[in-house]
Amino acid sequence: MTMYKEYNTNQLSLELNLAYDIPMNHEARLISLFVDSIPNHVLLEEKSHTGRPAFHPAMLLKMTLFAYARQVFSGRKIVQMNDEVIPMKWLSQDTYVSYKTINNFRSSKHANNLIKTAFIYFTLLMRENGMIEDDALFIDGTKLEADANLYSFTWKKAINKYEDTLNGKTAELYDTLVQEGVDLALSKEDCETSEGLVHLLEDTEQALAAVEKAISEEPKVIKGGSANKQKRRRIKKLRNQLKKDYLPRKQRYEKNRDILKERNSFSKTDHDATFMRMKEDHMMNGQLKPGYNVQAATNGQYVLAYDIFSNPTDTRTLKPFLNSIQTLDLFQHIVADAGYGSEENYVFIIDELAKTPLIPYGMYQKELTRKYKNSPNNPCNWNYLEETDQFMKPDGVIYSFKSYSRRCDKYGFQRDFKIYEADKIQDTPELEELAKTEGGNQKHIYYNPTWNYFKELIKEKLTSEEGSRIYAKRKTDVEPVFGRLKSVFGVRRVHVRGRQAVQTEIGFLFMSMNLTKLAKNLALRTLNTQKPHSDFIVLIVFKAEIVVWFYFKASFCPASLPQLLPLESP
């Protein structure tokens, strides 16, 4: 007979577990130590002194980070983890927490501020322990779908179109009221706003009341019918049209315009989401979906800063993103792909931030090809005559300076150009023909000295030994973070609505990814430096004094930065 160990779930046991314990190298311990290193003046918020005491934010933050590290994003499932998973019980100290408490904490303004501050402390921790290399920030972006209905779009062009039609109908109604003898206290142009329509409705109501009074003073029977009753019928019809149709539509259009701001679209179920083209296009029709543009700054595949934007492209996000990074002074090199290369971004990074951009411009790779370098139609391949301020085309056509030009884009950035026009008198009649367009006009080119200066500077930086070495790390530094976010954590769509809530959730995701990666790296480092089967303790030393030892936009910074020291267990 085969022997088995005794197994009986109905057997009464006298053994009582009075404490929950987890291994010393467990990621839950690192999460707990990191959160405990954040000072109380950052963790705690001002609460009411009456009523039931609130749960400590440190406990809620630990629970949320550990749940996100285990790819659990539902409030009810986090509560289930708290009932079943021992590391979660250890973090919460076996405290019962409702799913509403978890969800309220995740969507609160305090959690948003708390996770932003946590990234500052994490960056300082990484730098103090020598885990930040080359003083470089690697920046990239990805798009995540919003928690919004797919066909809940509202388009700016549609609002403008329908509002123009409504203004035309309102003008016709205004003229009709004037023909009916209604005394109006505002002009026709004033009726193009909701406030103007409200005043127009009030004037119409007063005119209708005056007609009602006139009807009450008339005899009951009038031969041929009462003219006032016919007038009342016409004015009442106009009043109802204005009250039930024109005014609500105008108010809805103005409300939608306030929601849009500078965007071209938004979702009715998540007003902060913007419709964008996603990489995951399963229908292969370029379908637009509501989403957010997530920007992340990394070093060593650790996310050190992040933010979300409504811009579908990355070019316009770089400047506000860099302004939001409070530890930017720790880094000298800003590394990104060609999607961020623009004159405005180069001016901002070099002139205002005094940083080194390792960001190629859009034509950088193409300009390195032999075909582009040998093309006679590219002004960069022409011979510049500095003494006479002229360009000579390879075919011999001379272009002389004509005038200056300034262009301003819709965002307010100005670009200065020099216009060069082909001379009417060339050395030969053949060249004079080449100097003209098909329409018989003189050819001309626009030359941007500032842009060409930055192009040459970027080429020099990217081809230098240090610049090429740092830029070569970009693909293996920042892009794996998004791959891990989407493939390992399975996050291609956010789970909350509203910009603040989405920003907080993305922060929880990135911080949980950082801490789990850090725990694995520490475990590997310990295995490589210590004897097999030996445990290690991650010790975070924190001193509660506050000093400002370098300039950044946060108000506080630890005097003794956190340190990670692998120690042998006794």
Predicted regions: what they are:
Residues 1, 46-50, 466:
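A ubiquitous short alpha-helical element
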Residues 85-87:
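Bromodomain acetyl-lysine reader domains
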Residues 91:
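Conserved active-site neighborhood of enzyme catalytic/cofactor-binding cores
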